[in-house]
Amino acid sequence: LFWHYLEKSELRPVVREEYKEPCSCLYVRDKKALLFEVTYYENRINFEVFHALTDGTGATEFLRELVKNYLYLAHKEEGLPEVQLAKDKLTVQDQENDSFSKYYNPDLKRTKRKKVKAYQIKKRGKEYEELKVVETTLSVKALLEKARAYGVSVTVLLTAAFICAIHEEMSRMQEKKPVILMVPVNLRKIFPSDSMLNFFGYIEPGYQFGGGKDSFEDVLEAVKLYFQENLSKEHMAGRMNELIAIEKHKILKWAPLELKNRCIRAGAKMAEQEVTAVLSNMSVVKMPEDYAQYIEKFGVYTSTNRTELCICSFQDTLSLGFTSRYDSTNIQRNFYRILKELGASVKVAEPDFPEDARPNYEGKKVLQIFTFCCIAAIVISMMTDIIISPGVHWSVFVAAGCATMWLTMAVGYVKRFNLLKNAAWQLLIMSGICVLWDLGTGWRGWSVNIGIPDICLLIQVVMLIISRIRSLSPREYMIYYVMAAVYSMILPLILLVTGVIHYRTPSVICIGCSFLLLIGLILFKRKEFKEEMHKKFHVG
């Protein structure tokens, strides 16, 4: 109701062969599912994770443990020793600590940043276009030597190369806007933390072309200076505080979740205009020497709506993972050419994914067909009215009936993954529809005297049946029972007190049964009731 949260799940992860395109959606709203997935294809192990669960560092640590345990089980007969990767005495609490809250300082003064609109790559792919993944490798040693020759880090060198690769696709008019990259920063390197939850910030190096100094060396020098000025502890703390201050705001904290989601989406849309592309360096992945002999490389890439370059290295192999949903791959081509000009030998890996498994949109197709049928029924009824009986407007009732059916089916489709939430929404919609039909047919009061109380009782019975059939735990059904019971008590009670209801029996029965359901939850499921109320409202 007010915020997103993570909760423990009894679901067991199942390892299976890769069956869908890389970086497919893991989080489906209202669907109870894990936020990570482990698959394999030939000699490759895949670990995909939803970003709300962890960041690149946390995902890397999990993958290291996963690979280590797999190799140990596969080769222990050959004498492979079992080793510990995690630090000694590292507890679950250490790994689940919220480091953002730990290092948040409300007294730290905020630094105002001038927001600049960045150049945007315009060549978008088609709707539902598959994610384009291009993976390349090169020698860490060779690239590191070149970076040292310039007096910069590998990240700075690749950032400058990426900016220049994008610039090559820009026109003179487009040079009015700078090329700006978002570069995530692992805050654990600045603020000590063993948390495996998200703990990262970001910086936004860029370059304004068109000033006469547009060579690679000019861009590299500007990026180098930006990194030096913006990777300080003070600067990153200020950036971190800006974000956490919004979460900690006493008024915004209690804003409805739906309102927050809309504001966040609007803010994200505006923030997109400040960034051209993303470069993420996951740094070095280390494995024990005994295990390293069985590993060829580590690679990383992320789902994105723009162009993103992810980097990680293992031993002397640097893996570059480009992901994009744009039609053009010219930027990637330019980037590889720049690296070759710097003396790096770039090897483009052959795609080794299974046959494309496109998303299944059959459910959406059914809703589209039903929508067309509803519109067709309304149009046909209007034509019939005009041709056969101009003075009678049966089409109005047909339109109202179609709208009623379409609304209930559309909500049912959207909320299909959570039947109890579906029922809660249907309770609200059907109550409103009853009143509208009563008003539209000449108010007789049947909607409030009989309709609403009966709907309230029916929905509560349906919820009980769903919970029984699906063997739902109290944690899964509690909030929906409470919402339905409270709604079914308060609304009929208000209608009774205000004198709107003239036939009292259905409303009295509805209020009494709803009250008993609520009391039963409090008495017999007290612990679960308090836990859910605290989780949803931070009370109790």
Identify the residue ranges that each predicted region occupies.
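Non-catalytic N-terminal regions of enzymes
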Residues: 1-91, 144, 148, 155, ...
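Short amphipathic alpha-helices and their capping loops
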Residues: 1-14, 82-134, 138
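Acyl/amide activation-and-transfer machinery of modular secondary-metabolite enzymes
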Residues: 2-18, 33-35, 124-135, 191-227, ...
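Helical lid/core segments from catalytic subdomains that handle acyl or acyl-like groups
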Residues: 133, 200-283
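Central hydrophobic cores of alpha-helical transmembrane segments
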Residues: 160, 223, 423-430, 478-489
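Membrane-helix interface and helix-disruption motif detector
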Residues: 376-400, 415-421, 436-455, 472-476, ...
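Hydrophobic alpha-helical membrane segments
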Residues: 455-466, 476-497
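Short, highly charged, low-complexity non-transmembrane loops/tails of multi-pass membrane proteins
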Residues: 529-540
